[in-house]
């Protein structure tokens, strides 16, 4: 995780994000193919947000919006007296709408917002289906509307998954299975521990995830990599090079992946790439015991085969127990 980030992505609760200042130019964002965003950072691979000093800049007419020295607008919300940064936007009303989205997720339908409540049940369902940290992440990366629209396209008028969505899910799984295996890595205790980062073997990193050149042919210090899992969920990881340890690492976003997949030391992570023009990246995982956690759809509980897709609650509860026992057993040994 980035050194200056104070939102724990592996939790549904949100910590404060302190104001950060820098005299360096604002970060530049580039697109590389369909699955990569590159960030030219000002320092140490950290995206820098600058909060305006109220005594120097005029205040906004909107709640939760603060002006920035570069003419843009920042959005923020407070929870338990701690500030949560929601990102920087070109227009003042964009920042205000970002605040409204966060307010609905943090405080419910009765939250005080800048604009008249136009949140429909479908959007409420979308908000409730994601953790606070996930919504904050979408707002910061300006992907909230896109992901909400995608959710709407995948539902029919009755709120059920469309046939097109079911077919798309089959395509995702097929693409995952036929993708080219780039490399695998057995995760170490530090990879799944409190350091919140995954070290990528240097030769694999330079071969498959080379950092592009920025100004003066100097490699940029970090970029965002997108990976799809077998279920079609997109995981965004910050990928950078640490001079201190001379290693390539996945940081921001990794801790959430570890928690959701309940990874333990000794588990196997695989990285794949599609063979089509999109060149999408995929990520898979298997337990140390050899159980394929990517495709397991049925488990046997008390002598009965239970569909994990149909009984989500049983799936989540059982996986938590199994993962907890699996990790504890490794520690004892």
Curated annotation (Swiss-Prot):
Signal peptide: none annotated. Residues 61-116, 183-289 bind DNA. GO terms for biological process: ethylene-activated signaling pathway. InterPro entries: AP2/ERF_dom, AP2/ERF_dom_sf, B3_DNA-bd, DNA-bd_dom_sf, DNA-bd_pseudobarrel_sf, LEC2-like. It comes from the Eukaryota. Coiled coil: none annotated. GO terms for cellular component: nucleus. It holds the Pfam family AP2. Keywords: Activator, DNA-binding, Ethylene signaling pathway, Nucleus, Transcription, Transcription regulation. Residues 1-27 are annotated as: Disordered. It is found in: Nucleus. The keyword Acetylation does not apply. Probably acts as a transcriptional activator. Binds to the GCC-box pathogenesis-related promoter element. May be involved in the regulation of gene expression by stress factors and by components of stress signal transduction pathways. This is AP2/ERF and B3 domain-containing transcription factor ARF14. The lineage of its organism: Eukaryota, Viridiplantae, Streptophyta, Embryophyta, Tracheophyta.
